[in-house]
Amino acid sequence: MLKGKTVLLGITGSIAAYKIAYLASALHKLHADVHVLMTENATNFINPITFETLTGNKCLVDTFDRNFQFQVEHVSIAKKADVVMIAPASANVIGKIANGLADDMLTTTVMACRCQKIFAPAMNTAMYENPIVQDNIRKLNHYGYEVITPASGYLACGDTGAGKMPEPETLLEYILREAAFEKDLSGKKVLVTAGPTQEAIDPVRCLTNHSSGKMGYAIAKMAMLRGAEVTLVSGPTAIEPPLFVKVLPVTSARDMFEAVTGVSDQQDIIIKAAAVADYRPKQVSEDKVKKNDDQASIELERTDDILKYLGQHKKDGQFLCGFSMETKNMIGNSRAKLEKKNLDMVAANNLKVEGAGFQGDTNVLTLITQDEEVSLPLMSKEDAALKILDKIISLTK
């Protein structure tokens, strides 16, 4: 995902410095060219050799290191950078850079970088809330630097409050948003639905399905990484929502209908990946239905057909993509859905094909439009999401 991208990690003197080893490793696994710069104080918390081992690149600390290469190191590395993250960012380094001071390898390199720079402050709550530090953060924001709001929690000093550096997984998402893909969906509003719905029988039981929401969440994340403004309408799932995506949680088919139709006219692209119940109990018991020896039956009624509604109310220039999960006659049933519901594309899969079912991390899709059918091989759901977006972009140019 980051192949061909250069990421600079600036580490300052903080106990949170050890966490950046996990971030450096994760970036390297995504094929980024990772370069680590440390302040002298940072080396008291973690050894530079750790980062050299994880990244395969020399860890830079001394501005005047005799590396015997005919280049000015801090300028050379700055020119290569696609994104810079200073994490943990101490009050000292925040103050230096906010006021134009550059007296070591890290600060001089940051000053020379023209790419996006992201700071992740880590310090005691009283230091973070100090008016001088807050003023310096405002200065960084004014100059176009991004400063991540620190988390609140138990700090190394024993206090509890704001000042905790976000976890490496969160920091990685900031870097991916900035550098993973070209922003070919910039300026577009994308609505994605994901997950199952739950239709109550009584306060204890419900009708639902096996959808995990993974495919829809992957589409939402990839669209965001490609620059779109993404709204995700999600049924109940166990998945952590992607950062930088507006999430509208829902439970029932009626909830999803109301959430989707409430924002659909504002969208450029709608991708409906949710597995919405076709039927719901006609009557919902206020109390738990007790079992007995007799056979039980539940009278059902149709739910609102969200995709049909969207097709009937599609605005000019809006792209509408549906999903079709089949067990037989996949192409025929999906093409009928495309025509009947006025869709621009259907992403179809067959539950009986290995790797294409619910819950898993892979999918096998066929992208069906008015003019063609494109069969995709087995791939991760994130890669499948990218293929869906590629196709949509090609059809909307």
Please name every model-derived segment.
Residues 1-119, 124-213, 217-397:
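A cross-family phosphate/adenosyl-ligand binding-site feature
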